[in-house]
Amino acid sequence: MRRILILVCGAMLFWTSCSDDEVVSSGPVIPETPEEEYPSVITTDNRGMMVSYDPVKGQKLGALISWKWMKDDPDNAAYDIYRSVDGGEFVKLNSKPIDKSTNYKDASVDISRKNVYELRFAGSGEALGSYTFTPEMAATFYKSIFLNMNDLPDLTGTVNPGENEEDGDEGEGASVGYKVSDAAIGDLDGDGQYEIVVKRQTYSWDPANAGYLPGTCLLEAYRLDNGAFMWRVDLGPNIRQGTHYNPFIVYDLDGDGKAELAVRTSELTKFGDGTIIGDVDGDGKTHYMNMNPSSGAYGKVVDGPEFLSIIDGVTGAEVARTDYIPRGDKLLWVGYWGDGYDYANRIDRFLMAVGHFNSQNSAPSIVMCRGYYKNFQIVALDYANGKLTKRWHFDTYPDYQDYVEQGNHNLAVGDVDGDGKDEIIYGACAIDHNGKGLYSTGLGHGDALHLGKFDPTREGLQVVTCHESPSKYGNNGLEMHDAATGEIIFGVSGDGDDIGRCMVCLLYTS
């Protein structure tokens, strides 16, 4: 059996010009000095057990039982799977311990009967988790959740301008409605079962394009076990709809066993408990979107407060807030962000992440980012006891000029140097766990990257990424480099094109 690592790149040519009833809530002030002690991560989980079954293939393939490997499990952990049929005794299914995977195929399952599966450590009588698989569940391989259609804005007569079909829009002239795009899962209420938070919006604007459609970006939480609606957060008119504008994170940030939601907000954001951010800056206005159709920034938001809000997973209420990375002086936008006040494209490129910068066993930090085409800033914050505390703030200006223009549309987080603390791969550069620059390859901006153990013959992790500008990447339009040092391992010429996509896959050949 031979294993072949394949790197695939795609050359894609891109052109970019590069109320009276308000309940006003205030946000905490962030101290400059972070707390030294962080709470240990608490895990309350039933292993996320799941049984997958394909009714089309039927019993030929059996049922696949899968579960999560937990961070406290020993490296040599081995498991047993037991099954009870129609309330009978539990019988072990595997003939030898399951020690190389976290799944097991039950080839003998009878889908006409109720099957209850238990996961145990090999040789143990104590259940780590269980899952009930019924004949009704076997009838389909997916679960339907009905979206909450109540209290949505009236969009009657609004049609799609047809500029963003690639983001899931249906094209020019199509009626506009609230469609689901991104989603994230997490245990919002601490019961050991996952919930899902979905983003709904009427249109996905690219920051390069001016324009306006009615509607605002919504984040909604649903239970996965029964599809019950939990809460809705309406980001409001000052957070423009679009993939680049509203990334969000669902993660247990304070180690209490319940996941929070972190997202960029502004005045007029409405939370799940009905609270609305009011006129926080006292300027007498709460609506900042440019509504001048003749402006190059029509439909964009270039003024007004911006925040990072932490939202309770159970209620959807805001529990902490701080200022987002500021836009800065408008006169400096062109030189710093790469475009001006009347365009507002590169300034409004946002990313978010989570990293364990203290240790892998401590509560994580939330990471907010702004910019990547030219200068950019990254801030890591810790959330504990209802407060946000700044851990570090990275800025390419003035000390990291070799990091300018090195960001991607995406990032990756992992312990790349083996110190037990996470680093951030930010396109063609890396930021250390302490917020200091680790390295920059200088190969420039790109649209895709992957962090992983791609070369088993080398120590540590590798990064596979593609790049946009031939003047930057030279002979390395697609390349793999050492994640800890930035050393180029090998590269592929881009033939003078924008290499818009890349992928890594492992193929097995006989």
Label every PLM stretch briefly:
Residues 152-162, 171-182, 236-247, 328-334, ...:
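Repeat-based blade/solenoid architectures
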Residues 124-141:
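Extracellular fibronectin type III
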Residues 68-69, 73-113:
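Recognizes extended acidic, P/S/T-rich segments that occur
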Residues 109-124:
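Beta-strand-rich modules
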Residues 199-215, 264-302, 468-471:
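Short, conserved, GDST-rich strand-edge loop motifs in beta-rich repeat architectures
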Residues 508-509:
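Conserved small/polar residues in nucleotide/adenosyl-binding loops
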Residues 15-40:
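Bacterial Sec-dependent N-terminal signal peptides
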Residues 191, 256, 283, 419:
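Acidic carboxylate motifs that coordinate Ca2+ or other divalent cations, activating on Asp/Glu
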